[in-house]
A protein has these predicted regions:
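ATP-dependent phospho-/nucleotidyl transfer catalytic cores
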Residues: 1-30
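Generic structural signal for well-ordered, non-transmembrane alpha-helical segments
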Residues: 5-12, 108-111, 141
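Conserved catalytic-loop position in the HRD/HxD motif
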Residues: 29, 34, 39, 51
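Activation-loop N-terminal segment of eukaryotic-like protein kinases
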Residues: 42-45
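Activation segment
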Residues: 47, 55-57
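Active-site activation/catalytic loop segments of kinase-like enzymes and analogous catalytic loops
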Residues: 61-94, 107-126
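ATP/Mg2+ or Mg2+-diphosphate-binding catalytic cores
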Residues: 114-156
Length: 156
């Protein structure tokens, strides 16, 4: 409960940022929905994406944000790596300022904290598992780095 207020404030800032954004047809397309390292495989013909069960018509940066979030969690929110990921994406697709604002709003949301606490609330258990407690402690410990990453990546 000690961290709830700050996480809620961050979530509200994220939502406020995203609510300002329109679903501009120029920036939408088919998104994988769960684009991460587990859904990219190497074949004899090159790299391929698999598992499109969660695909959707949405902002293109949603897949980039999901991929970045997974990578950054595993690399302690390294700003240099985040910059490299955005630049690699930019080599393939132009990122307009409006899309960068969407990316900022998505990455600002404390998704992992929400995911863990939501899992607990919906499990209908009277106790939280030791595994979930450890996950929650890790997320809370990384929160300062995560927020610094978002601020530095977008020069805020």
């Amino acid at each position: 409960m000690r961290h709830y207020a700050s996480m809620l404030e961050t979530a509200e800032a994220s939502i406020a940022c995203l609510e300002k954004q329109e679903l501009n047809a120029l920036y939408v397309g088919i998104c994988h929905g769960e684009y991460n390292q587990h859904n990219v495989v190497r074949t004899d013909d090159g790299w391929r994406m698999v598992h499109f069960e969660n695909y959707a018509y949405s902002w293109r940066v949603v897949d980039l944000a999901n991929f970045m979030r997974k990578m950054m969690e595993k690399h302690n929110w390294d700003v240099a790596l985040g910059d490299a990921l955005v630049e690699a994406y930019r080599k393939e697709y132009e990122l307009k300022q409006e899309e960068l604002q969407k990316l900022y709003g998505i990455l600002l949301f404390p998704e992992k904290f929400w995911k863990i606490t939501n899992h607990y609330m919906n499990s209908r258990k009277t106790w939280i598992s030791e595994r979930d407690i450890e996950k929650l402690k890790k997320v809370i410990a990384q929160e300062t780095e995560r927020l610094n990453f978002v601020e530095n990546l977008f020069h805020i």
